[in-house]
């Protein structure tokens, strides 16, 4: 059972890979359009210079990809600790898969309808799942 906790990490890796592919399949055509319009892309080499240059849909995909390198890094670390200490149980598995599902739906919402309150709700629910993993492991590792 312990190794099953690693599957959600692989799922998140696949989600990140899919978002990377979407980012490049939207950004490269948009960059070619800008270049054809005479925009010097080299002057946009820093992310802070890109704000508002690309269409919103293109930016949302890139933003989502970047988001997958923020909060999920804590998820990866916590899951690895759970696995390394052999603490995997049903609650950990449910929370880890809930986290993955919520982050996946969050990604879909962000790159499509981008409804702010729905995204925020999904983000907060994913934090509940992550906090469940984190604090159960803190108790298991330090208190018991």
What residues fall within each predicted segment?
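N-terminal signal-anchor transmembrane alpha helix
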Residues: 3-44
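Hydrophobic alpha-helical transmembrane segments of multipass integral membrane proteins
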Residues: 10-21, 71-74, 97-104, 124-135
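Short membrane-interface loop/juxtamembrane segments of multi-pass integral membrane proteins
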Residues: 43-65
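Core segments of transmembrane alpha-helices
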Residues: 66-81
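Short alpha-helical packing/oligomerization segments
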Residues: 77-99
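Alpha-helical transmembrane segments of multipass membrane proteins
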Residues: 80-84, 104-108, 138
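Interfacial loop-to-transmembrane junctions
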Residues: 105-129
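Juxtamembrane boundary at the C-terminal end of a transmembrane helix
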Residues: 133-144
């Amino acid at each position: 059972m312990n190794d099953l906790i690693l599957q959600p990490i692989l799922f998140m890796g696949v989600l990140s890979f899919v978002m990377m592919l979407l980012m490049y399949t939207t950004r490269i055509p948009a960059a070619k359009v800008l270049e054809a319009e005479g925009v010097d892309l080299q002057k946009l080499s820093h992310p802070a210079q890109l704000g508002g240059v690309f269409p919103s849909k293109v930016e949302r995909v890139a933003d989502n990809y970047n988001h997958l390198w923020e909060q999920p890094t804590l998820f990866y670390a916590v899951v690895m600790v759970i696995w390394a200490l052999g603490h995997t149980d049903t609650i950990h598995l449910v929370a880890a898969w809930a986290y993955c599902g919520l982050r996946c739906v969050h990604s879909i919402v962000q790159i499509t309808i981008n409804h702010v309150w729905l995204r925020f709700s999904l983000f907060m629910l994913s934090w509940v799942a992550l906090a469940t993993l984190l604090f159960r492991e803190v108790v298991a590792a330090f208190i018991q």
